[in-house]
Amino acid sequence: MLDAFDRYPLTFGPTPIEKLERLTDHLGGKVQLYAKREDCNSGLAFGGNKLRKLEYIIPDAIASGADTLVSIGGVQSNHTRMVAAVAAKIGFKCRLVQEAWVPHEDAVYDRVGNIMLSRIMGADVRLVDDGFDIGIRRSWEEAIEEVKAAGGKPYAIPAGASVHKYGGLGYVGFAEEVRAQEAALGFAFDYIVVCTVTGSSHAGMAVGFAKDGRADHVIGIDASFTPDQTRAQVLEIAQRTADLVKLGREMRPEDIVLVEDYAYPVYGVPSEETKDAIRLVGRLEGMITDPVYEGKSMQGMIDLVKKGYFPEGSKVLYAHLGGAPALNGYGYAFRNG
């Protein structure tokens, strides 16, 4: 599905799938849980899902003649960390807008974790007071104009790389990769669980798995706390991506499954249940999830298993998208583990 598109390799190769034996047993053993470790996909600044997306965006950036990647996210954005890493790797400058997406008061929130790594890698990081929104941001557009005014040649990458024209391609590739791994494993996964906010990971998966009739078996766990906007954006990205890869059918609203129950109390702030899920999977599997994204999708998967959402005997693949560096910004919440 992706042969027609240029790809700039940024990852090690196919990410491993592991059985979550102890978590499976802890939850009763009726649903078999696995994880695909996108958090271990690269040596670039701790890796993560954004690299799959950027592999299909960077060839366009290079071909454009740009010299500066310009992107945006929250203060502890995993995406902007990855943009900074890729800029360093390919010899570009990097301008990052870090907005106040999270009402979080940890004393060192804007000096540790992802934003610290971006600064170490040489990005020009600017803090902005604007609040959370997954759409196109004025502060980002202003940064692009400022780079131009200073004589630079900017290449614009939106939040999460999601609404970029090629933003969904990387996770079409994820689906193709999973199919190859399923052939080696001797079984197919019944469900794939993924955290959904800006939407292109979910959208790309839905398109990729639509090829074999599993689009609506991709279960998005909303972490945006703006589910209507998120659902609409996932569908829009999926429709555009399906056209790009010549899927052969339209992506429909019923292809996009988004569970809304776990994003509370607000984007970027973990509930007690999210923190409990982070601790549980850490103590059972040694697997680290973050308070903004993966902790909430892990909470969701655990709760859905407990509620019987997945039929007995199901094999469920959890897409671990990364994000652990953000934990550093939540040190007080986890001061006792």
UniProtKB/Swiss-Prot annotation:
At the top level, the lineage of the source is Bacteria
Q: Which CDD domains match?
A: ACCD
Q: Required cofactors, per record?
A: pyridoxal 5'-phosphate
Q: Which residues carry this modification: N6-(pyridoxal phosphate)lysine?
A: 50
GO terms, molecular function: 1-aminocyclopropane-1-carboxylate deaminase activity; D-cysteine desulfhydrase activity; pyridoxal phosphate binding
According to UniProt, the reaction catalysed is: 1-aminocyclopropane-1-carboxylate + H2O = 2-oxobutanoate + NH4(+)
What does the subunit section of this Swiss-Prot or TrEMBL entry state?
Homotrimer.
Query: Family assignment?
Result: Belongs to the ACC deaminase/D-cysteine desulfhydrase family.
Can you name this protein? 1-aminocyclopropane-1-carboxylate deaminase
List the lineage, top down.
Bacteria, Pseudomonadati, Pseudomonadota, Alphaproteobacteria, Hyphomicrobiales
